[in-house]
Structures are given as C-alpha cells and as structure tokens.
Amino acid sequence: MADTTGRIPLWIIGTVTGIPVIGLIGIFFYGSYSGLGSSL
C-alpha cells in the first residue's frame, strides 16, 4: 500500500491521526464537564 510513497515519517502519521483523536477527546471531555456527557 505504501510502496509508491516509500518511507512515511512517523510524525506525519501521528499528526494526521492525532489531530482528529485529540479533537474527539476534547469534545468528549468538554461534554462531560458541561454535563452533556452524563446523559450518555
């Protein structure tokens, strides 16, 4: 799958996959702190 691109820097993969994860975690904690997460 990654044969044409060669080596992909891990920091690029970490950034691309980390930003959405941090966003979802941030939304989750914001919802729990504001009281919205308690209804889940």
Curated annotation (Swiss-Prot):
Q: Name one GO cellular component term.
A: photosystem II
| Stored InterPro entries | PSII_PsbJ, PSII_PsbJ_sf
One Pfam match, given by its short name, reads PsbJ
**Record's SUPFAM superfamilies?**
Photosystem II reaction center protein J, PsbJ
Q: Which domain of life is it from?
A: Eukaryota
Q: Which UniProt keywords apply?
A: Chloroplast, Membrane, Photosynthesis, Photosystem II, Plastid, Reaction center, Thylakoid, Transmembrane, Transmembrane helix
Q: How does it sit in the membrane?
A: Single-pass membrane protein
**Membrane-crossing segments per the record:** 8-28
GO terms, biological process: photosynthesis
Gene3D superfamilies, from UniProt?
A: 6.10.250.2070
The protein's location, in the record's own words, is:
Plastid, Chloroplast thylakoid membrane
Similarity comment: family membership: Belongs to the PsbJ family.
Listed under subunit, the entry gives: PSII is composed of 1 copy each of membrane proteins PsbA, PsbB, PsbC, PsbD, PsbE, PsbF, PsbH, PsbI, PsbJ, PsbK, PsbL, PsbM, PsbT, PsbX, PsbY, PsbZ, Psb30/Ycf12, at least 3 peripheral proteins of the oxygen-evolving complex and a large number of cofactors. It forms dimeric complexes.
Q: Which NCBIfam families match?
A: PRK02565.1
Protein name as it appears in the record: Photosystem II reaction center protein J
Q: Which organism is it from?
A: Populus trichocarpa
